Design a protein with these regions (language model features):
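Transmembrane helices of ABC transporter permease
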Residues: 211-220, 224, 286-335, 407-420, ...
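Helix-to-loop junction immediately C-terminal to a conserved catalytic motif
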Residues: 528
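ABC-family ATPase nucleotide-binding domain "signature/switch" substructure
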Residues: 522, 559, 564, 572-575, ...
Length: 716
């Protein structure tokens, strides 16, 4: 196997949970295929805890591999001819995945580590961490796609983003050409001043020369300011455009996508737009000027002294190489900084969201130490990057000194030998002094480009993911929902439930009960089309398959009160309307008609009370009342209530139950509850979810006649 090919196709993980899919993506790229971490995360069922070997097996088969799982030994692993994924246990019992490419009799096993890179491990070293002896072999079959389609799509996506900026960017480039040419004015004038003007003692020539130089330098300043303004305008437009497009893509991704992502990482990737724009500005400003300065400087050096020009031309590649050879280390260090930054952001958010638990359990010291560790790792990555930059600075600085001294010594000898004049020496030194920074910038240009490339890939992974479907049959009413032989599992996980059958009709309240974790809420989310089921069918009005209905028209007809209520920054009215424009009379009529007014009048400013992060703290019951008002204002024809009254007091719950009885003739209601005592008088049918399937169903009187989860509650 070609080591360079392996190193070039190896993929580093974006966070700790990515190690499994990063290994799979490395093997895909090794075989000249293409995919993305986000797509593999979704298909494999990767969660914040990571990926199962089953999940990797399932997605590998989907992507055109012959995948086989084994529990084997080191000797057999050494005989594998194709790269395989192995499950290892690192220090502190941390579960991890590695790619084993092949075995070399002298060097050992060639390992691709998504956390560190490519390296060799001896058989004993690998055996020490490979505790489970589990591995997944992967061999591409005829269905495996080898194409550069993804690269073309990335290019098209990026070009579409900057297409509107072409005019401003080209103007900036042309102005950069003028600025680069004017940059030589001082060196040329210095040479003329020393060699011609001052020796001739011609005041008129001196004044006119200084006047011309002043005009050129002022023109350079003016053009630079104008150019910066154009780039500033482009920066604003581009950042708005890419942020809007990326955020819009994010909002239209399937709900399952957000289940496997930390908020801090999503925020960090939204901020990646700044890195991309910085590089665009760099390419259209500094890069253009540096290239032109380098070319023009070399031309002038050859003009003053072809020997000095030749020495510079031969020496600069060495100077360039000294800087360029550090690129790989810098790029790897930059990647680690970005990963640790995202992890640190996530830790902040996670800690702040759990502040009540932390305080109640007196765990401030624990989380303080955790933050210190996470932030310390982040700072350590920044420190390591800084050390590389310092090392690069002194190496390039040393090379610059030797090069400048060499040119100074050689040109001084030329002056002694009267090969060049003193003014020409001064001009040469001035040109060389401006040439070296430009060469250094060109040598380092790949670093910000690769940083932006990493940021771009991180953004494109989200932007290119398959959005929720848009087409389908438009419906205008929901009379019934019929679930037949429904089975479901999360990707890479065991079957959650199987052969579920139930019927929900308008005019009835259908409840489902079962142990925690049995899949009741997941079933509710399947009915919302947040997840795709494995087998079976869900029919609407006994006519349309749920997945064949246009998603927007379906969700316009349903309403949901979830377990976790989201209260947005704004007033109570804002949280009910969610952007709808209505007259005050209309909303007051709704609030009064449904009986919510007394509850909202208890708040400090009534319906105008500011709630959310910037407002008052609401109790769980108050949040549920707002959520109930929000969903009923929508006038749904299919209502899903997931523990919708769990935080309410007795009177508020009684009010909610009476409200459901009132609206029941107009819609079908699916009620998920652990509070079984509330179902006795309100539920028309109750389904019992036990042992991964529906074991019993009927009304209260029917269910208590048999032995089941529901009847056991009433017998206690």
């Amino acid at each position: 196997m070609n080591l360079k090919n392996i190193e070039s196709t190896h993929v580093l993980q974006h966070d700790q949970s990515d190690c499994g899919v990063a290994c799979l993506l490395s093997i895909i790229k090794f075989h000249k295929g293409d995919s993305s971490l986000e797509k593999l995360r979704e298909l494999s069922g990767t969660t914040q805890q990571g990926t199962t070997l089953l999940g990797l097996y399932q997605v590998a088969n989907q992507l055109g591999f012959i995948a086989e799982g084994f529990q084997t030994n080191i000797r057999t692993l050494a005989e594998f001819e194709q790269p395989s994924i192995i499950h290892v246990t690192l220090e502190n019992q941390l579960q991890h995945y590695l790619v084993c490419y092949h075995y070399d009799n002298e060097k050992g096993f060639l390992i691709g580590d998504p956390a560190k890179g490519v390296y060799y491990l001896s058989a004993s070293e690998l055996n020490q961490v490979w505790v489970s002896k589990k591995c997944l072999t992967l061999e591409p079959n005829v269905k495996f796609e080898k194409s550069a389609t993804s690269k073309n799509n990335k290019k098209k996506w990026f070009v579409d983003l900057i297409k509107q900026d072409y005019k401003l960017l080209w103007i900036s480039v042309l102005l950069g050409v003028v600025i680069a040419c004017l940059g030589m004015a001082m060196s040329i004038f210095s040479q003329k001043l020393i060699d011609d003007i001052l020796p001739s003692h011609k005041i008129t020539k001196l004044v006119s020369g200084i006047g011309l130089l002043t005009i050129l330098l002022l023109a350079r300043v003016g053009i630079s300011v104008l150019r910066e303004y154009f780039l500033l305008q482009q920066t604003k437009d581009f950042n708005n455009r890419i942020n809007n497009q990326f955020f819009s893509s994010l909002l239209h991704l399937p709900k399952s996508f957000f289940d496997t992502r930390k908020i801090g990482e999503l925020v960090a990737r939204l901020n990646d737009t700044q890195r991309i724009q910085s590089v665009i500005k760099l390419l259209t400003s500094s890069l253009v000027i540096d290239v032109l300065v380098s070319i023009i400087s070399l031309v002038f050096l050859f003009g003053y002294s072809w020997k000095v020009g030749l020495i510079s031309l031969l020496s600069l590649p060495i100077y360039f190489y000294i800087i360029y050879r550090s690129n790989k280390k810098i790029i790897q260090s930059q990647t680690e900084v970005m990963q640790s930054y995202a992890f640190n952001e996530g830790n902040y958010i996670n800690t702040i969201q759990g502040i009540s638990t932390i305080k109640n359990d007196n765990k401030q010291a624990v989380f303080k130490n955790l933050n210190q560790t996470v932030f310390g790792i982040f700072q350590e990555k920044i420190f390591n990057l800084g050390k590389i930059n310092i090392q690069l600075s002194w190496q390039s600085g040393l090379a610059s000194v030797f090069f400048l001294i060499g040119v100074l010594v050689y040109t001084s000898i030329q002056v002694f030998n009267k090969e060049i004049k003193l003014g020409e020496l001064m001009a040469i030194l001035g040109i060389v002094s401006s040439l070296l920074p430009s060469i250094a910038n060109l040598a380092l240009i790949s670093i910000p480009i690769n940083e932006a490339k990493i940021a771009f890939n991180r953004m494109y992974e989200f932007a290119s993911m398959e959005k929720e479907p848009e087409g389908g049959q438009t419906i205008f009413e929901i009379q019934s929902i019929t679930v037949q032989d429904l089975s479901f599992r999360f990707a890479g996980r065991k079957e959650l439930f199987k052969n579920i059958n139930l019927n929900i009709e308008r005019g009835k309240l259908v409840a489902i009960v079962g142990e925690s974790g049995s899949g009741k809420s997941t079933l509710g989310q399947i009915l919302q089309r947040f997840y795709s089921f494995e087998s079976g069918s869900i029919k609407v009005n006994n006519e349309y398959e749920l997945n064949d209905i246009e998603l927007k028209s379906f969700r316009n007809l349903i309403g949901v009160v979830p377990q976790e209520i989201n209260i947005f920054n704004g007033t109570v009215i804002d949280n009910i309307l969610l952007g709808d424009s209505v007259t005050p009379e209309t909303i007051m009529e709704f609030i009064t008609q449904y009986g919510f007014l007394d509850y909202f009048n208890q708040l400090p400013q009534g319906l105008g009370t500011i709630v959310g992060e910037e407002g008052i703290n609401l109790s769980g019951g108050q949040k549920q009342i707002i959520a109930l008002a929000r969903v009923l204002y929508k006038q749904p024809q299919f209502l899903i209530l997931d523990e919708a009254t769990s935080a309410m007091d007795r009177n508020t719950e009684k009010f909610s139950m009476e409200l459901l009885e009132k609206i029941k003739p107009k819609c079908a209601i699916f009620f998920i509850s652990h509070r079984l005592n509330t179902l006795k008088n309100i539920a028309d049918e109750i389904y019992v979810l036990e042992n991964k399937t529906i074991t019993h169903y009927g009304n209260h009187e029917q269910l208590i006649q048999t032995s089941n989860f529901y009847s056991e509650y009433w017998k206690e």
